[in-house]
From Swiss-Prot:
GO terms for cellular component: cytosolic large ribosomal subunit. Belongs to the universal ribosomal protein uL15 family. Residues 1-45 are annotated as: Disordered. It comes from Rhizobium leguminosarum bv. trifolii (strain WSM2304). Pfam families: Ribosomal_L27A. This is Large ribosomal subunit protein uL15. The gene is rplO. It comes from the Bacteria.
């Protein structure tokens, strides 16, 4: 057997049906869709319609709500901060805050502030000013000889 002798098994491939190409083709006019009705039209399915059965989105109860006042923090790991310091994008001696992280390309936007999580290790001694930090993250930063200052959340508009 040679590469040029390889072919598909008999009957494993089918040529595409060209629908609606005249009565002589055997699948002209209605093209195998039957006559009239919703299913004969293009774009058949109505999303969420289950043929008269009560659809799942109506069978299940409504639950919860979206809090429009919820704070949306940008999450940054210690590993990402350390990587930025190692790459020379972030100055460990200067104060690390949201603006510095954005300038270094660690985060894209500040949203409601930055929250630091303890994922990874931190070797550098840094002074960090952020909106939030997890307890393990604060412990790791202080263990490395750094300090953490948490910004108070802005008061809700009266």
């Amino acid at each position: 057997m040679k590469l040029n002798e390889i072919k598909d098994n008999e009957g494993s491939t089918h040529s595409r049906k060209r629908l609606g190409r005249g009565i002589g083709s055997g699948s002209g006019k209605t093209g195998g869709r039957g006559v009239k009705g919703q299913k004969s039209r293009s774009g058949v399915a109505i999303n969420g319609f289950e043929g008269g059965q009560m659809p799942i989105y109506r069978r299940l109860p409504k639950r919860g709500f979206n809090n429009i006042f919820a704070s949306d923090f940008v999450v940054v790991s210690l590993a990402r901060i350390q990587a930025a310091i190692d790459a020379g994008k972030l100055d460990a001696k200067a104060t690390v805050d949201a603006a510095a992280l954005k300038a270094a390309g660690v985060i894209r936007r500040t949203k409601d502030g930055v929250r630091v999580l303890a994922d990874g290790e931190l070797k550098a001694k840094i002074t960090i000013v952020v909106a939030g930090a997890s307890k393990p993250a604060v412990e790791k930063i202080e263990k490395a000889g750094g300090t953490v200052t948490l910004l108070s959340a802005p008061a809700a508009a009266e």
